[in-house]
Regions:
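Hydrophobic/aromatic-lined pockets within catalytic cores
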Residues: 1, 10-13, 106, 110, ...
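Catalytic phosphate/metal-binding cores of nucleic-acid and nucleotide-processing enzymes, i.e., regions
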Residues: 10, 74, 120, 124
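Short helix-terminating capping/connector loops at secondary-structure junctions
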Residues: 20-22, 60-61, 114-118
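Active-site/catalytic core of tyrosine-dependent DNA strand-transfer enzymes
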Residues: 43-105
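C-terminal catalytic core of tyrosine-transesterase DNA break-rejoin enzymes
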Residues: 98-130
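Catalytic-site neighborhood detector that most strongly recognizes the C-terminal catalytic loop/helix
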Residues: 125-144
Length: 144
């Protein structure tokens, strides 16, 4: 979610510590839908570590922010404009990338030995939906 990305700077150090401890999940607190914290699985530790290192370096050079704007609204506007400017539209929009992540997560859980219903329920929770939303996740994200 875009708001999670923009506000994630508040959790970068915590996430870095989690990765260094070899945790398999990260807790997303800021910018979540309805303000409900959620946990999400780390599918690629190396990629997550690299993204965190890059984000921490950016925050250090931008007054502790990932987007150096005076308020959330202007930061969100900047985020959306920059995403479109670099081609994150259509099949590559941030929400489309969420779909792709969900499909990768479903495959990950299936490979871990979970059955399809379990995998969908876990992905529903990873996405910030309740565990009872597995059927919704199957309909929206689960076309694999």
């Amino acid at each position: 979610r875009s708001q999670e990305a923009v506000q994630s700077v508040q959790s970068l150090k915590t996430w870095k510590q989690a990765v260094e401890r070899s945790d398999t999940r990260l807790t997303v607190v800021f910018g979540t839908k309805g303000g409900r914290p959620r946990e999400t699985v780390i599918l690629d530790t190396i990629a997550v570590r690299k993204a965190l290192d890059n984000a921490l370096a950016i925050a250090e050079s931008c007054h502790g922010r990932l987007i150096d704007k005076p308020d959330l609204k202007s930061a969100m506007d900047y985020w959306h404009n920059q995403a479109a400017r670099i081609g994150l539209t259509g099949a590559y929009s941030p929400h489309s990338l969420r779909y792709a992540w969900a499909q990768d997560a479903i495959s990950h859980y299936l490979a871990q030995g979970f059955n399809r219903k379990e995998a969908l329920a876990i992905v529903a929770m990873d996405l910030g939906h309740g565990d009872g939303r597995g059927r919704y996740v199957a309909q929206v994200y689960g076309q694999i």
